[in-house]
A protein has these predicted regions:
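PLP-dependent amino-acid enzyme catalytic core
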Residues: 1-161
Length: 161
């Protein structure tokens, strides 16, 4: 087992190999058994640490799968722009994987998105467009309508939904 040091002492590395891309970190997150919860019981509690994905959530898996599938089936061309409405972790996953795979990303988001999520999205290179998240489906200012409009204006743009 490889051991790595950190500020709290020594801990086992969950993946000590050298990877060729940050996308190789997506998935295969560690599983930890919570012994203290089951002391004296005839059961096991295992938790999957999805926060260990590069974007901080299980949505990185979804983004990677969506992009790889779309690239494989030809609906997402090399270098094409990804346009999606999201105010959460799916947008962060798409921005991260999009950047790593050479796709510009435009995220249409709510005005209520947290500063932390906004910072992550921009750090991953996403262009942000604010939408009225409470606008009904018939309102041209709702997030989906804005995403559809932007995607229609950009040659070869791709939407996951």
């Amino acid at each position: 087992m490889t051991i790595i040091g950190d500020s709290r002492g020594v801990r086992p590395a969950y993946n000590a190999g050298i990877l060729s891309s940050v996308t190789d970190l997506i998935g295969n997150t560690p599983i930890v058994e919570l012994h203290n919860l089951t002391r004296g019981l005839d059961c096991r509690v295992l938790v999957k640490l999805e926060s260990r994905n590069p974007g901080g959530s299980s949505k990185d898996r979804i983004a990677l799968n969506l992009i790889r599938t779309a690239e494989a089936d030809g609906s997402l061309l090399p270098g094409a722009t990804i346009v999606e409405s999201s105010s959460g972790n799916t947008g962060i996953g798409l921005a991260l994987v999009g950047r790593l795979t050479g796709h510009p990303v435009i995220i249409i988001h709510s005005a209520f998105i947290s500063n932390e999520k906004r910072a992550l999205l921009t750090a991953y290179g996403a262009e942000l467009v604010e939408a009225d998240w409470e606008a009904g489906p018939e309102n041209p200012q709702n997030a989906r309508a804005i995403a559809d409009r932007i995607a229609a204006e950009i040659p070869n743009a791709w939407r996951s939904s």
